[in-house]
Amino acid sequence: MIEISGLTKTLYGGGHKVEILKSIGLTIPSGQFIAITGHSGSGKTTLLSLIAGLDNPSQGTIKIDGQDITKLNEDELALLRGKRFGFIFQNFHLIPTLTALENVVLSAELNNTPGATKKSEDLLGIVGLGDRQHHYPAQLSGGEQQRLSLARAFVNEPNIILADEPTGNLDSKNSNRIIELIRELHRVKQATIILVTHEPQVAKQSQRILTLEDGKIIDDQINREL
């Protein structure tokens, strides 16, 4: 479970104070698929970065299964991210000199995940890249590269997946395919998924939709359509 209380992020510059997030309170049960929406500048990506421990809040707490990650040092946060988190970004961050399989295996080996090669091969099969595992990223389409990113994110069997605009650079066909795969992996792996998107049709594929505006939560609803 993720419990966020009084979370505030304030930036200072040029004699001005800008509150990016304003006393956010939020509880995300384990295994929930939640989408965070809002206009550009509403605080979506900042909230995701704080949950990942990639940035420090000005005030407030972020507890993951009761542990306040705002109290951890950088080494402790790095260990937590490696063991508990998977990341999916708009830009794929793949290593161009490694094959698809090697990209996934490397992520597993860096986190000492047992059976790295077998798990990587299985996940590449799930995302439809089983026959392309020996291709390099440059030989894959944009949609295929994002599917490779999905496999890499899930290979360490993380408890929490953080996805920042994972369909932002894709056409509608590939966007739909990625969201279908995220939903399928969510069903199979039972990870908590927090997905930031500005696309309403993408948000509607989640179990819960949270809307931010001007650094505050203005709407929080269970998706009854699913």
Task: Give names to the regions the model predicted.
Residues I209-Q221:
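H-loop (His-switch) and adjacent beta-strand-loop-beta switch element
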Residues S42, Q221-I222:
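Short, low-complexity polar/charged micro-motifs in intrinsically disordered terminal tails
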Residues I2-L212:
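ABC family nucleotide-binding domain
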Residues R224-L226:
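ABC ATPase nucleotide-binding domains
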